[in-house]
Amino acid sequence: MSDVKLSSLFELETVEQNLYRGESWDLGFRALFGGQVLGQALAAAYETVDKDRVAHSFHTYFLLPGDAKKPVVYDVEVVRDGRSFSARRVKAIQDGKSIFYMTASFQVPQDGMHHQAPEMPDVPPPEAVQSDIEFYEANFNKIARPMREALSYHRPVDIR
């Protein structure tokens, strides 16, 4: 998988105000990968908020399986824009049916009580650590026989 291909999934086409279309990428699963729908829905919501706001909370509901061979339309509802917070509701649609809902809240970063560290920890880059396949191969004899087959097939996503 190329980084360019993955990042391009989050470059949505603007259909009209608050309505976006995202291309699907068939990863070989039975249905559209939910992480893609979630990421595109969040990208669509970001298109409608001021650039100084960051997502700090979202809740999602996967309603129906999506079709990886078809694009997804994202309908963003502006719930509220306040001085510090913005709220959005996003509906993902395929074939006229809602397949996913997300409610997201965005906030202007402020000083105050922190529940999580805003910065990523200092870790090696992905290229410097072994992939899941390399790990499985190195530990093949330690993995129960029924799990070996399930873990050894080629996946279109490189996990590190």
List where the protein language model places each region.
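Terminal targeting signals and extreme-terminal segments of soluble enzymes
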Residues: 1-160
